[in-house]
Amino acid sequence: MDVSRARSALRGWGGVAVMAVLCALALAFVLLLPYTQQAPDDARQAGQKAVTGTQARADGCVDAEAHERTPAPSGADGPTIDAIKARTGAKRKLIVGVDQNSYRWGYRNPNTDGAQLEGFDIDLVHRIAEDILGDPDAVQFKAIPTNQRIPAIEDGRVDMVVRTMTITCGRLEHVAFSAPYFKTGQQVLAPTSSPITGYDASLAHKKVCTAAGSTALAKLEADRKGGRLPATTDLSTTVPNQLDCLVRLQLGEVDAVVTDGALAASQAAQDPTVELKGAPFTTEYYGVAMKKDAGDLVRRVNRVLVDYRAHGWQTSYDDWLSATLGKDSAASKPPAPQYQRGS
């Protein structure tokens, strides 16, 4: 609270009265703050146990439940979809930001003609393009680094981003999300010979790599600051693309990587010298990200997802992810959608 600014803006006895109220509220906030932030004794033991749970925001949004804020499905076109359909000739395509380096999610397969983009996310993009433009190949793919996903949407460089992007309260302030299409959680990836056992005290004095702008980085910074992660854990290594962390790990420049377990499992499949350490310590959901004012496009994608969950999702999972995540794991079924009331 900026008391000096409030004081300069107020004049007269009425201003004095309001200032008294503001000061009283500020005092109450300070007195109550330690109670709102106090953690249980066992949770305050820095890194002694795996950290679970979610982070609530001031507006009441909880990250693990943020996907419930998405609007309900609809097949009706609107200004966003009309603009996409109005593109002519070779430009009549859905412009989608994707990854081209995440094995089995969005990557260029060197064994195909022209090193075609393939993966779980790519399958979903083709389904959305088919529904909107009548052609699954009517897509212009744009490779977007992890830390450029939101700017690419806000700047209008892409119509949407389908790139293992977690739905969070903070991101909902900048973009709109579809209903979730995948459930995962943060995990630790480290060399098989490493003494690191998971998201716990074994990360003390260890250098951890994360992607800039990722939910992993935000979680680690918050937990270290709150005493739920060893204070000596080094979080200074951040990279534009999540896959760069695997390279740093292979070169011995970092001791561990923290990222979505679904991505970490695919990386472990690429390199048998690394493995997942410990269980997931968060619950997260991937969604298709779009502009905040693109309500018609969000609803249209949600309608696509309704059909995709019933016809297509499981086939894509079995093709790309079952080998690394398992056929009967918690990730092996699509998450159930929940929508805003009255939407």
Q: What positions do the PLM features span?
A:
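A ligand-binding cleft/hinge motif common to bilobed small-molecule-binding domains
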Residues: 148, 164-173, 221, 247-283
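Bilobed "Venus flytrap"/periplasmic-binding protein-like clamshell domains
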Residues: 103, 115-132, 165-168, 184-241, ...
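Periplasmic-binding protein-like
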Residues: 46-51, 182-190, 265, 269-305, ...
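Extracytoplasmic small-molecule ligand-binding "clamshell" domains
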Residues: 54-161
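C-terminal region of N-terminal signal peptides and the immediate post-cleavage residues
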Residues: 26-49
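Ligand-binding clefts/hinges and TM-proximal coupling segments of bilobed small-molecule sensing domains
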Residues: 66-78, 215-236, 308-343
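Acidic, polar ligand-binding/catalytic clefts
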Residues: 34, 137-201
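Short beta-strand-to-loop elements that line the ligand-binding cleft
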Residues: 136-145, 231-241, 278
